[in-house]
Amino acid sequence: MNYRVQPTAQVADTAEIGAGSSVWELAQIREGARLGEGCVVGRGAYVGTDVRIGNNVKLQNYALVYEPAELEDGVFIGPAVVLTNDHNPRSVDPEGKQKRGGDWEAVGVKVAEGASVGARSVCVAPVRIGRWAMVAAGSVVTKDVPDFALVMGVPARQAGWVGRAGVRLVERDGEPGVWECPQTGALYDEKDGALTERAV
């Protein structure tokens, strides 16, 4: 075994965990879940059945990732974040009978490469969090988030752009639609509500 699982964690026999990953106390990884290499699953975090997680992903303490979520490489899920999976949640059907597993269809949240979801945020499925986007702490995401977008609030709304470093981008003086990372100097172009990286 080339990964670490704490004794109080529960990992299903059919789950796959990549090399160099760590699963901390009281975490639960369900049947068929697949985690890539170098992942960290924090204390009390939950990974649902058949969830797909890429390499170098961090799930902080008490994050809840319900199936059929998909997290690409380099994703950060903050403490107590919830990725939901039921668009019309009910305990009972219209006749008052308790709903069972086959009585509803799970829908997932997709989090693209490098994106971050801040502490105690809720992503209401089905939504996609774009590449390198950032969801501010405490937000409720009900719509897709564009690549590199910074969103915040309830419901979450775009409040700017961020680069790969996670720092808010600044629009260059005299160059409308050209954004720069103050930390790395990387340049980005905005067109029709989308942001793209300039080739280096």
For each predicted feature, which ranges?
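Flexible, glycine/small-residue-enriched loop-and-beta-strand segment within the central core
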Residues: M1-P7, S22-R128
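Short Cys/His-rich Zn2+-coordinating modules
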Residues: N56, Q60, G96-Q98, V117, ...
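Cys/His-rich microdomains that often coordinate metals
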Residues: Q158, V167-V170, L187-Y188
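Cys/His-enriched microdomains
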Residues: Q158-W161, W179
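Short cysteine-rich clusters marking metal-coordination/redox-active sites
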Residues: G163, C181-T184
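Short metal-binding segments enriched for Cys and/or His
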Residues: L187-V200
